[in-house]
């Protein structure tokens, strides 16, 4: 049996573990799936590790759960796999808690992040997910050609494939201090928000134009002193919103036609629907807010002083230094953080597979880096090449199908070889 190591015990990791359990229940030779995480299961959704207060609404409909879109992807075994995955559905979770009819009658409200984390933890437990505690400190390829995942605990997991999930560290601005109460990022803001919810008016600048920034801005609008001033710094000086339509949503759920689109059109689609846009719900809140404005430019430098924070704003050839009481840098997370974990052998093979190309362009159908053996699966980088739903929560069931298929095929081939050897 092959082993698949997943760095991160969040939605993607849990979806893969649950699907492996469903495949095994349907009689398919699923791999052993090991989830590696330094914190608790679904910890980034609880509010205890930053990234959210835990009370923010889920950005996607909860029906797009661990098994969505429940596609018949496994031939004759498909019905059994889909039925097994239905046991891990959001609706099943509500039914077991006696909350299904209430949820329907209230208009299928989106759960909070904390409620979503409880669902994820229940799925992980029900699926019997194997979870190893500890941070991954090194990913290298051993003499046997398999991955060696080393942990801070000193343990090592040997695996036939590795999946990288979860947000990387926050992207920073030059001069941004690591530990200053009035300079925060998209993760730490939620751990220090009380510093900005004071009884006096503050001037705050939020740097960013995506959903991370939107969540921070809405929280500030709701909880800061009513006379506070909140600036949002974006490259274009305008907050664009994303409307939803069947045609857009279809490509998130079923990206079969996605690779056939011209790359320029795929990039435009991602720009319009997934990157640098506020949701309509966020825009509705901000449309009613006072003391809120947008500025054009980029954050060129931060200077944190004792009583204020100086933000240098660059726009074209102009540079302006503006003093704020606080600055929140919410420009996203480093999706390529895993590169710092790659050991010598893995680094050489990874760079050879990448060549002079852009990483986002060389992600294969199974969400791995094309040409890299053993496979390294990077769903967060798969949006451009394979479909817009893979980096987020829009098609977790399809994501797990894509990744697990090669390991099921490998296990079948090994079993067939072993059987032939017995009869030789």
Question: What kind of feature is each model-predicted range?
Answer:
Residues 53, 82, 96-98, 124-130:
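Amphipathic alpha-helical interaction segments
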Residues 1-40, 45, 102-211, 215-424:
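Flavin (primarily FAD) cofactor-binding/catalytic cores of flavoenzymes
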Residues 68-103, 109:
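A conserved beta-strand/loop capping segment in the N-terminal third of enzymes
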Residues 39-79, 239-256:
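Conserved N-terminal glycine-rich FAD pyrophosphate-binding loop of Rossmann-like flavoproteins
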